[in-house]
């Protein structure tokens, strides 16, 4: 629980909770930032539910976009592989975690 809290604070310190789409960053770095933030988001909700603790990341406190459902490359010549990606499942997990967060807020508010 404490380690996750430190990870979330570090993510917030480097601005992972803020939209970076207009920043001058390579597409792969932007996508990595989104994925790392949402990994913290999902873990925050799962650990909060398991431990009965309040959420650290509130939905109103971030504006970063959802990750995309495919691999992102900096080189336009790299082809996106055919078939489903693991990121489809990750996005569904994020959406379920959002619902879990609302349930936890209702339970513990």
Where are these regions (language model features)?
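Basic, alpha-helical interaction scaffolds
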Residues: 90-93
């Amino acid at each position: 629980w404490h380690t996750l809290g430190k990870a979330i604070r570090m993510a917030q310190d480097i601005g992972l909770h803020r939209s970076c789409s207009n920043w001058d960053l390579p597409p792969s770095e932007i996508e990595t930032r989104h994925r790392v933030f949402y990994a913290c988001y999902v873990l925050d909700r799962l650990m909060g539910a398991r431990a009965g603790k309040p959420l650290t990341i509130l939905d109103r406190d971030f504006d970063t976009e959802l990750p995309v459902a495919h691999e992102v490359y900096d080189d336009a010549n790299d082809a996106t592989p055919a078939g489903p990606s693991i990121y489809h499942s990750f996005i569904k997990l994020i959406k379920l975690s959002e619902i879990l967060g609302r349930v936890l807020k209702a339970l513990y508010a």
